[in-house]
Structures are given as C-alpha cells and as structure tokens.
Amino acid sequence: MQVRFGRRSGQAKESQGMDCFEKEEIPYPPLLPSKVDLQQITIIPHAEWERIRDSLNRLTREAAVLRAERAAKKKMHVKSQELVKHWTNTYAGMKEQKLKAKQKRDEEIEAERKVLDLEEEIYKEGERKKAIESARQCQFHQTERVKRFHSGLLLSRVMKERDVQIQYKKNAVKSDKKWEEQVKLNDEKAFKEDQEKEEKRRRERVALAEDHLKQIEEHKEEEEARKKSEEKDAEEMKRQNLLYEIEMKKNLSKKQEEIDTNRKLLLDNMHNKNIIRAVEQQQQEEEDEKIRKFIKAKKRLIQMRMDKDAETHRLMEERRERINNFLSKLIKEKLDTEDLIIARDISEADAELEKREKEKHEKNQADLKAIAEYRASVMKNKEEEERQRKIEAKEQLQAVLKADKIFQELEKEKSLKVTREKLEIQDAHIQQIAINKYNAKQMKEEELDYWRLTDALTVEKEKEFEKYAREVINFESESTKKYAYPMVKAVQEGVGGGRGPPFVGRGGIRPSYQATDATGVQLPCFKSQGSKYNDFQKSKRRLGFTW
C-alpha cells in the first residue's frame, strides 16, 4: 500500500465540476508514479509519518549515540593517561621507575663487568708475558753452555764451601798434626785426580779431533769416488746411445728386408690368383656339366612322369569302361532316378579327371620353362662374375701400388720423426743440465745464507751468554775472587759451548750436536744414521737416469 500526505481515504472534497472530470483522463501529480491507482493510496498525517520514521531509524540513532559515547570515553581515557603519565604515585609510574632503576643497575653491573674483564685481560697478559719470559729463561738455562757454566758456578760454590769447612776443621783440630797431614795428602790426591781427569779430557778431545779429521778425509774420498762414478756413468750413457743408433740402423735394414719380402709375396700372390682363376674356370665347367646332367635327368623324369600319366590314363579308361559296363547293368536293374544320379556322378568324375590331366600338362610345361630360364640366368651370372672379377683384380693391383707408395711415405715420416725426437732429447738433456747447475748454485747460496744467519744468531746468543755470565761472576766475586776460576774457564771454552772441535773458518764456533727427536738432548759427537746420498739429482745421475 502506498502512503502519501493529504486527505484520508473516503473523504474526497465535493465540487461541481467533478462529473465533467470523471469522463476525462485524470492527470497524476508529479509525486506519484505513473500507472498507480489513486484509490489504493492511503494518506496519513505528518505526526504519524514522523513516528513511523523515528521507529524505523531508532536502531541507527542508538548505534550513533553509543559510538559517540565510546569515542568520548576513549578521548577522556587518553587525556587521563597524558595527565598521569609523569605521576610517581601510580602503579604505571612505580613500574616505570622500577624498570628504569633496574636498567640503571644493569648498566652499572655491565660497566663493572667490563672493568673486571679489562683488569683480568691485563692480568692474563702479564701472566702470559711472565710465562713467556720464564719459558725463555728456562730454555736459555737448558742450553749446554749455560749448563756447563752453572756446573762451574756450582763447582766454585762447592769449592768455597769446602774451604770454609776445611778452615773450620783446621781451627777445630789445630793440634792434630796427623790429621793435617792426612788433609794435605787428600788435597794432593784430589789435585792429582783433577789433573788426571783434565789430561783424560784433553786426550778425548784430541781423539775426537782426529776422528773428525778422519771423517773429513773419508768424505773427500767419497766425493772423488762419486765424481769417478759420474764420469763412468757418462761414458756408459754414450756407449748406450751408440748401441741405440746401431740397433736403429739394424731395425731399418730389417724393415727394408720385410718390405722386399712383402713385395715378393704380393707378386707370388698375383701369380697364384691366375692359377686360382684357371681352377675356378675348370670348376665352372664341371658345374655346367653337372647342370647339363641335371637337365637330362630332369627330362628323363619328365618322360617317366608322362609314361606314368599315360599308364594312369589307360587304367582310368579301363576303369571307366568297367564303370560303364557296371552302369549298363544297373540301368537294367534300378529305377530311373538312380540311373540319372549315377550318370551325373560319372559325368562329374570324367570332368574332374580331365581337369586334373590338363593341370598336370600345364605344370610340366611351366617346369620346363623355369628350367630354361634358370639356365639362362646362371650363364648370365657367370659372365657378369667373370667381368666383375677382372675389374676387382685391376682395382686390387692399383690399391697395392698405392699402399706401397703410402708405406714408403710413412717410413720416410718415421725416420724424420726419429731424427726430431733425438734432437728434442738432446735439447732436453742440455736444458736439464742447465737447470741442475742453476739449482746447485741456488742451493749453495741458500746454504751460505743459512750459515750467515746462524753466525749472526750465534753472535747474539754469545752476547746474551756473556752478559749473563758477567753478571753472575761479578755477583759471586763480591764475596770472594778466589773461586771464580771454574766459571771463567766454563765461559772461555769457546763459542757454541758444544763438545766438538772449534771451527776456525766459522769464528771458532763449537757446534752442539743434538738428537733428532723432541727432547733435543746434547750428544757427545755427530753421527749420521741416514743415507750418504741425500741429494736427489746426484742420486739419479749416479743410478744412470737422464730425466
């Protein structure tokens, strides 16, 4: 139902001209849609319309009011938060203060930890330096020369202590002459023993020096023997090269003989092929003779078959005659229908027999024709094979001549290749000799650099040792200068502090021979347990290798 503003239904205004309008078309107002029956429209007052509209929009209006209240509350909450954000007597303020205090404490603890870590790092660095210095001092004290110096220091202290004890005993038993004499004898005996020990050590040093000189002479003899061996190896290499050239010439002459032999065999083979061709022609004639005999036998078989067919035909005629006689008897004895059936069977049998005879004759003619065609094709194939054999023989001869020419070219290339290889080997030998000389020179320079560095390191160690020994001797000499001789003697034994003889060409150094293991124990002398030939290139030359 459509509702419009206006009068109520059924209360139309009376007018005099209504009748005239009823007959005409009633125009629709602009607010009404077209094609609407005005009698179906209900008109309500404005207050009623407002009430209806308010009832329809109530939910929307209430939702808008709720949203406005919620927005106002949220705005008030934000304003309250901004207002109490810096207050300290609230839960949030106290929580924030606690967090800040905790963060500050953590930062202070972290700063203290960093300071402690830095102090610990400095302490560890100092400990490491102390450990390194202690290890260096320990390593310095473990050297043989320092050990010998410490032995001298200990000997001087022992001698000083012994003199103190002797003096004490002398003062205690001064009246005992016998004891004094005994002490004197003991001193003389000890002095004599010291002299004997010193003489023994001197003899040992002389023996060690003689042993070293003997080893040097042996090394010189070994070097001379090695040079002689190398010269002998060079002569042997020249002899081997000469034998190799002679062997190559023999191989070339042998290959030429093989070429001549192969050429001769080729000619003999061609002669044998002519003989084989004659034999094959004879075999072909024999085969033709076999074919002719086969044709004759085939003709004989055909004739026998024809005779057999004639005999069969005669027998069939006799059988037909017997059948006719029998049928003539049956005609008299049986009914007409049976006679007709028998006559029809006989006629069919005769037709079938004639058909078989005709097929046999056609088959015989076809066999004869096939035999003639086969013979003609065989003769034609023989002629074609003979012509093809002649062509192949000619081509084979040309191929042999071409192969001979190619073989000669290959032999020529091989000889050139052998010459080039010899030249390359010679160049390689020259280059290898130059490389070996350069390597030997380089190794010599490296060895000289090593000895120079060793000398510098020895001088530095000698200065360090002298400084240490001077400080110790000065400290010990403050109390007494009488017993400083063992320390001075240990210091003056020579540079290096080893047990070997001093090397005059290297500043008088006495080398310290050590074991080849991790202990580094001082050895009394040098003794090599390895191979004498530790040079790889020299070992190869000694064994005869040239690469």
UniProtKB/Swiss-Prot annotation:
Signal peptide: none annotated. One of its GO terms (biological process) is flagellated sperm motility. Microtubule inner protein (MIP) part of the dynein-decorated doublet microtubules (DMTs) in cilia axoneme, which is required for motile cilia beating. Microtubule inner protein component of sperm flagellar doublet microtubules. GO terms for cellular component: axonemal B tubule inner sheath; axonemal microtubule; sperm flagellum. The gene is Cfap210. The keyword Cytoplasm applies. Keywords: Cell projection, Cilium, Coiled coil, Cytoplasm, Cytoskeleton, Flagellum. Residues 214-237 are annotated as: Disordered. Residues 50-131, 183-251, 342-405 form a coiled coil. This is Cilia- and flagella- associated protein 210. It is found in: Cytoplasm, Cytoskeleton, Cilium axoneme; Cytoplasm, Cytoskeleton, Flagellum axoneme.
